[in-house]
Each structure stands twice: as C-alpha cells, then as structure tokens.
UniProtKB/Swiss-Prot annotation:
This is Flagellar hook-basal body complex protein FliE. Pfam families: FliE. Transmembrane segments: none annotated. Keywords: Bacterial flagellum. It comes from the Bacteria. NCBIfam families: fliE (TIGR00205). It is found in: Bacterial flagellum basal body. GO terms for cellular component: bacterial-type flagellum basal body. It comes from Serratia proteamaculans (strain 568).
Length: 104
C-alpha cells in the first residue's frame, strides 16, 4: 500500500509540474487566489493528520484489516506534511519581512 501511495503522489507532482510549465508566467490563473490555495493546502495537512490519527486509534482498539506498517507510514506522511507546512510558513514570513524592509 505504501508504494502505491508514493506512486500516486509522484504522479500528482508530475502533473502539477507540467501544468505549472504550461501556465503563462506573467498572468495569474483566473479565479484562483493565494488565500484559497493556502487554505486548501492547510486543509489537506489537517486531513492527513486526522486520517493518520484515526487509523492509529483503530489499530489500537484492534479493528481488523489495519496493519502496523500502514499506521506507521500514515503517521510519517502526516509528520512530513506538517513539517513541509511549517517550512512553507517560514519562507512566507521571511519573504514578507524582506518586502517590508525594502526602501520605497
């Protein structure tokens, strides 16, 4: 299961890279705002954490069909997605501070 999940993520990343390459660099996509994209990304991180937590709880109470390796992989995915979110936040704060320090 973990390998299939990784392959799915790789395919999604490749599709996103292709779409990004095809977009015009100077024009913003119509109807897409930074705030909505940020909210969606944070929502995905939250969903990943909730799913991992639920799977861990189900494993603890002995729900059949849930293996320890699946639980550990999902918990690790959750941890990595949170770390990525924190790093993106740090870069955004750094960029904001740099813009605020520019002379007008």
């Amino acid at each position: 299961m973990a390998i299939q999940g990784i392959e799915g993520v790789l395919q999604q990343l490749q599709a996103t890279a292709i779409q990004a390459g095809q977009m015009d660099r100077g024009a913003a996509a119509p109807g897409v705002s930074f705030a909505s994209e940020l909210k969606t990304a944070i929502g995905k991180i939250s969903d990943t954490q909730q799913a991992a937590r639920k799977q861990a709880q189900d494993f603890e109470i002995g729900v059949p069909g849930i293996s320890l390796n699946d639980v550990l992989v999902d918990l690790q995915k959750s941890s990595i997605s949170l770390q990525m979110g924190v790093q993106v936040r740090n870069k955004l704060v750094s960029a904001y501070q740099e813009v605020m320090n520019m002379a007008v």
